[in-house]
Amino acid sequence: MSQQTITAREREFLKFAIDSGVLRFGEFTLKSGRVSPYFFNAGLFNTGALLARLARFYAATLAAVEPEDFMLFGPAYKGIPLAAATAAALAERHNRHVPFAFNRKEIKDHGEGGQIVGAEIAGRVVIIDDVVTAGTAVGEAIEIIELAGAQPAALIIALDREEETSENGPSAVQDIRDRLGLTVHAIARFSKLIEYLRDTPNLSNQVSALEAYRDRYGMLGE
């Protein structure tokens, strides 16, 4: 668990996710079979206003941690709107003119053809997604980027669950770092969510359930 104090941007993002109904509390059965006391459904950032605001959080995080030139790659399908909206936010808010591209899951054999849509994949490439679980989509994105002769530089996600993928195994983020060699940035992390809830009177009653979940499945050293 991170020992750093929650930042203003993390606090603002978590409030935004909760107020938007994207981050909810209760009992949710995950694909893994675990019963989680919270659920983050980024698919509910489904209006222009919500997507634009989400993109500003991605852009602010990237502007702070990626001083060098880079381009964005959005894995199909969830990464597509994230890449486009974040590139726009980087230009509008940070004067960073970042190319973006995404892949088709089905290769097109007419028109412009091919698998890649958008800018030519070149240079340092940051992969953008909402969350990671198994890391399969990230691995496929790395293959596409390397096949184009470019450098997979980092992955950015909205929320790092900081949760082991199997008993005593690494978290999805740790696995991507160790197995795929990618730096991983996140707008917010599970440990910061607990801190945010602890400091928010009308939500502090959720803390004990999240702490119990962290104690059972969390990556305390991440």
Q: Which positions does each model-derived feature cover?
A:
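PRPP-associated nucleotide enzymes
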Residues: 1-128, 133-222
